Amino acid sequence: MKKRVVSILVCMVMALGLFAGCSSSEPAGGNETTETTAAGTQAQGTAPASDLKYAVVLHALNSSFYAKMQQGAEEAGKALGIKVDVMAPTTANNLAEQISMIETCISSGYDGIATVVWDPDGFADVIKKANDAGIPVISLNQKSGKDDGVMFVGQDLEESGYMLGKYMFGQVMGGKGKYIIASCAPADSALIAREQGIKRAAKEFPEIEFVDLVDITTDLTTAVGVIENAYLAHPDVNAFLGVDVFSESIGTFIESNKLNGKVYGAGFDLTEGTLKHISNNAMQLTIGQNPFLQGYYPVMQLFTHDKFGYDLLNMNTGAFLVTKDNVSEVKPE
């Protein structure tokens, strides 16, 4: 059986039980369809039909990780028998395009919006506009980092960075050495929080030294080149620590240059490539965050808010550490 964070699974089972109790007693069956639209995908299922419709506006759909969030949102829509449209900008982290999508969702009369709030200030006005129109908004995967009153479904970002740093600095690097942080979007509030967590862990190790932060972009090929250049500039660096799904590029660089065991790597998310790098000792750690649930639970929360009047809640989707000791038991996502 593939491992998952047990507490999260328990929460999911409880949630499914709750909604099963509210569903029709008619036998399962009928047609289940997923229709592709210009804005993204539209999911509808066989549960009792509802006029409610929700928009899930992601910041990107250019990796298997984001596809898992999309799948989670669509499966929630199918389970509830409601319309869920998943969409994202044509280029990753395009703030103007994402804001425009949200504004279109507001004017189109969606009953609720879930979105990735990755910029500390950029979403405040459009969220207020939605709320003024009576449309609830919940954030997923990333949050602004400010006390903006928007509930969040995702990982404890700063703490997950701390966990990564603590493991790498203590158990892998033996309390000494130099490290570089690799980020696909240095301005993202979530990635900044993880960086802060890593640096908090570093304070516990006086002989650990931060060297630099490099922008690896959201293209894996480009990312490998950026990491290589950083290594050439700092050949005495001992570890590259990623803070996002493109951490996979760290392992690619290490393995391609036969630096396994000499330079260490760590990062986030459970892509197939990253898990292979863990198995081959090109990376020593990656941390999962359950992207399926990050798509699933916002839709469920919006539904219970609109249907039954429950408040939206913060939900922690967990941090699952994967090392060489358990990588063989982990399923890519």
Residue ranges of predicted features:
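A residue-level marker of the well-folded mature domains of exported/periplasmic proteins
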Residues: K2-V5, M14, L18, C22-E333
